[in-house]
Amino acid sequence: MSRYTDMFTRLDEAGEGAFVPFIMLNDPSPEDSFQIISTAIEAGADALELGVPFSDPVADGPTVAESHLRALDGGSTVDSCLALIARVREAYPEIPIGMLIYGNVPFTRGLDKFYREFAEAGADSILLPDVPVREGAPFIQAAEGAGIDPIFIAPAQASETTLEGVSAASKGYIYAISRDGVTGTERESSTTGLTDVVDNIKRFGGAPILLGFGISSPKHVADAIAAGAAGAITGSAITKIIASHCEGEHPNPSTITDPEGLRKELTEFISAMKAATKKQ
């Protein structure tokens, strides 16, 4: 069984959904990033979604876009991201590790090499937010050849054809977005209609559904679980916490000014978000 299957089975038996934080790798440095990831896991994260910094993150709002920039200002490369994933995998052998990476990266490295490298580092799944499922065939083939679960986004207003394609192609989980647009707590998730979003995808079968985009509070998590999702992904809210403890001006590297304060704030936030996954 895959790590995702193990996780969803365990959580289902416990009457819980999954809480999955999105964290940008190397923001603001590799060592800081490892400590942030460790804090998230120890505070209750069930799985990880890790970003690889990119210079033109079109699917991200301002908060996450700035985290790409901080990591790049600190010298982040794809190779340093792979090294950090391997370090996380060695420290936490059971946790599912999902990647969020823009499509230019696999094109630059070559599809087969790209998926093989991330599999060898310890990643379980890869989502390319700028690659729709209708263009996914070569990525799916390369991912499955390397033992990586391909993940696709199910947009809130997707056509029947898209939802059917996403449900068939996504392994591990399906990333359903609670509203269309870019990531971020700048626009909070609308909890009205979440059940319709989830039910619409479930009609086609497929992997468990994780809801993302604009999920920034325990209530949003609880609403996602109540709507029938298997869990929720939170990114911008966590990235904002990290940013509030960083000091530095682009293009210079940023530093974390209060590591203990950051650890405490992240722990409190993630613990509260995880507590909201308990099914009523």
UniProtKB/Swiss-Prot annotation:
Any GO CC annotation of this UniProt entry: cytosol
Subunit: Tetramer of two alpha and two beta chains.
Coiled-coil blocks: none
Pathway where this protein functions: Amino-acid biosynthesis; L-tryptophan biosynthesis; L-tryptophan from chorismate: step 5/5
UniProt keywords, alphabetically: Amino-acid biosynthesis, Aromatic amino acid biosynthesis, Lyase, Tryptophan biosynthesis
Function per UniProt: The alpha subunit is responsible for the aldol cleavage of indoleglycerol phosphate to indole and glyceraldehyde 3-phosphate.
Transmembrane segments: none
PANTHER family: TRYPTOPHAN SYNTHASE ALPHA CHAIN, CHLOROPLASTIC, TRYPTOPHAN SYNTHASE, ALPHA CHAIN
Catalytic reactions of this protein: (1S,2R)-1-C-(indol-3-yl)glycerol 3-phosphate + L-serine = D-glyceraldehyde 3-phosphate + L-tryptophan + H2O
Family stated for the protein in its record: Belongs to the TrpA family.
Active site location: 49, 60
Superkingdom: Bacteria
GO MF annotation, one: tryptophan synthase activity
Pfam families: Trp_syntA
EC number(s) from the headed UniProt entry: 4.2.1.20
Record-given protein name: Tryptophan synthase alpha chain
